[in-house]
């Protein structure tokens, strides 16, 4: 699959559907309320993310593809917050604002990576006339390569048949992630992407792959579809088209943390690839890879071109080994989204010895990922003298990359890694030796971000200087 690319230079996509604002409150739970038998959450931070059709648009924007988003919001603070989130990602928002309805908002309260409660703020848009949306659609659809109708059953797509006709008249493919059991309303769509539960709720229970194919082809004929992509969780995906063999794709997921927004990712990548002129098979392959990435994240999230490219070429989603600073920032961001604890240390590591190995193993045990920042040759020379380093940077990094305890390696050219640590902001900063925590470069930055700093002991008698001395003594 190496010929596949995660770059989509010719794609432009239009999204129309139920837009939402997802809010997350994070905090610690250490006691039960005296007022009722419920935990008390001391909220320490909060996040806002785009949900529903807005998350679809975010997924497309994360692939560096121009995207326009149509939808209904309230004329309120939540609507302004959602618009702000989207515009930061260069998404063109073209909303119809209603004073009669609030922006759909879902507030989730989490503690220790567990969701305790969800609060929904919404009123259905079923009684809202679609004239303004249809006018916007007629104008915008002429300039894109694909249209996504994102249906969450909130009423934005009340006039979905009219929307499908507008797109088909413009010869633009229409992709729909369906909601409910009334698939008749999606008649004439180019591609539907139901999950297995949604498919069986309409077609009936399937006992085998043959059942899925038979009932899926009947669904295509019944509703005048061009194709059907059924997402099947741990069994991957199945693409069905009339007069063509079924195209089965096994799952790409390694670990599943959260399926929130996975359907959004699938349809986003599908539409983007089709708008770029890819075949349906290639579009499905890329969507399947992207779904395997996004279920490894916490909450609604998007997949970047770097992640998709890595996964296509068999590299891990988070990446391992030697990285640039920007690659490391991205890997750390993804790991934190999965709730992983990031540990960071640094050093010259000129001649690797058992003391180094033991130290790095102990540091790795303190978290889920270990970053090792390594001084460049110029930096080592300034710190240790003109005769150092013995091994150049490439050699030192290559040896460290072979250790199972080390996840990520990055080089820095300054005398200390303070600036780098301030950019990465690990959860735990570790240093070996007899330092006081406040003396460690980067400690202030880590503490200011709510992280911790720890000092680990080195093994007695193990040092690079001792190794060099022994070698020189042998020569003498």
Swiss-Prot record:
Coiled coil: none annotated. GO terms for cellular component: cytosol. The keyword Transferase applies. One of its GO terms (molecular function) is phosphotransferase activity, alcohol group as acceptor. It comes from the Bacteria. It catalyses: D-glycero-beta-D-manno-heptose 7-phosphate + ATP = D-glycero-beta-D-manno-heptose 1,7-bisphosphate + ADP + H(+); D-glycero-beta-D-manno-heptose 1-phosphate + ATP + H(+) = ADP-D-glycero-beta-D-manno-heptose + diphosphate. The active site is at residue 264. Pathway: Nucleotide-sugar biosynthesis; ADP-L-glycero-beta-D-manno-heptose biosynthesis; ADP-L-glycero-beta-D-manno-heptose from D-glycero-beta-D-manno-heptose 7-phosphate: step 1/4; Nucleotide-sugar biosynthesis; ADP-L-glycero-beta-D-manno-heptose biosynthesis; ADP-L-glycero-beta-D-manno-heptose from D-glycero-beta-D-manno-heptose 7-phosphate: step 3/4. Homodimer. In the N-terminal section; belongs to the carbohydrate kinase PfkB family. Catalyzes the ADP transfer from ATP to D-glycero-beta-D-manno-heptose 1-phosphate, yielding ADP-D-glycero-beta-D-manno-heptose. This is Bifunctional protein HldE. It comes from Actinobacillus succinogenes (strain ATCC 55618 / DSM 22257 / CCUG 43843 / 130Z). The lineage of its organism: Bacteria, Pseudomonadati, Pseudomonadota, Gammaproteobacteria, Pasteurellales.
């Amino acid at each position: 699959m190496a010929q596949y690319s995660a770059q989509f230079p010719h794609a432009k996509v239009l999204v129309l559907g139920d837009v939402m604002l997802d809010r997350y409150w994070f905090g610690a739970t250490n006691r039960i309320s005296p007022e009722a038998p419920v935990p008390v959450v001391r909220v320490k931070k909060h996040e806002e993310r785009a949900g529903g059709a807005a998350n679809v648009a975010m997924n497309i924007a994360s692939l560096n593809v121009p995207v326009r988003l149509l939808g209904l919001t309230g004329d309120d603070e939540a609507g302004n917050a959602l618009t702000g989130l989207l515009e930061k990602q260069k998404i063109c928002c073209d909303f119809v604002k209603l004073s009669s309805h609030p922006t759909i908002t879902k507030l989730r309260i989490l503690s220790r990576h567990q969701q305790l409660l969800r609060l929904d703020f919404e009123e259905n848009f079923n009684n809202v006339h679609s004239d303004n949306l249809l006018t916007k659609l007629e104008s915008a659809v002429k300039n894109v390569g694909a249209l996504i109708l994102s249906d969450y059953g909130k009423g934005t797509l009340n006039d979905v048949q009219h929307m499908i006709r507008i797109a088909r008249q413009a010869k633009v493919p229409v992709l729909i992630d369906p909601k409910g059991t009334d698939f008749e309303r999606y008649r004439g769509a180019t591609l539907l992407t139901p999950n297995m539960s949604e498919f069986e709720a309409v077609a009936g229970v399937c006992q085998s792959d043959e059942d899925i194919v038979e009932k899926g082809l009947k669904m295509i004929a019944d509703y005048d579809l061009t194709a059907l992509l059924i997402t099947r969780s741990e069994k991957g995906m199945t693409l069905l088209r009339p007069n063509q063999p079924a195209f089965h794709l096994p799952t790409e997921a390694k670990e599943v943390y959260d399926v929130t927004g996975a359907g959004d990712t699938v349809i986003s990548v599908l539409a983007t690839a089709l708008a770029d002129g890819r075949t349906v098979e290639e579009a499905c392959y890329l969507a399947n890879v992207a779904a395997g990435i996004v279920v490894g994240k916490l909450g609604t999230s998007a997949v970047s071109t770097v992640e998709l490219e890595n996964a296509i070429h068999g590299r891990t989603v988070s990446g391992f080994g030697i990285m640039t600073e920007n690659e490391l920032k991205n890997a750390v961001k993804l790991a934190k989204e999965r709730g992983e604890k990031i540990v960071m240390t640094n050093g010259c590591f000129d001649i690797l010895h058992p003391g180094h190995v033991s130290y790095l193993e102990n540091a790795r045990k303190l978290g889920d990922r270990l970053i090792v920042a390594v001084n460049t040759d110029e930096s080592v020379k300034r710190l240790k003298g003109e005769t150092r380093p013995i091994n150049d940077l490439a050699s030192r990094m290559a040896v460290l990359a072979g250790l199972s305890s080390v996840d990520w390696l990055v080089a820095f050219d300054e005398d200390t890694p303070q600036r780098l640590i301030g950019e990465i902001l690990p959860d735990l900063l570790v240093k070996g030796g007899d330092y006081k925590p406040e003396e460690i470069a980067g400690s202030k930055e880590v503490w200011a971000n709510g992280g911790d700093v720890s000092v680990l002991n080195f093994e007695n008698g193990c040092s690079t200087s001792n190794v060099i001395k022994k070698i020189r003594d042998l020569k003498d």
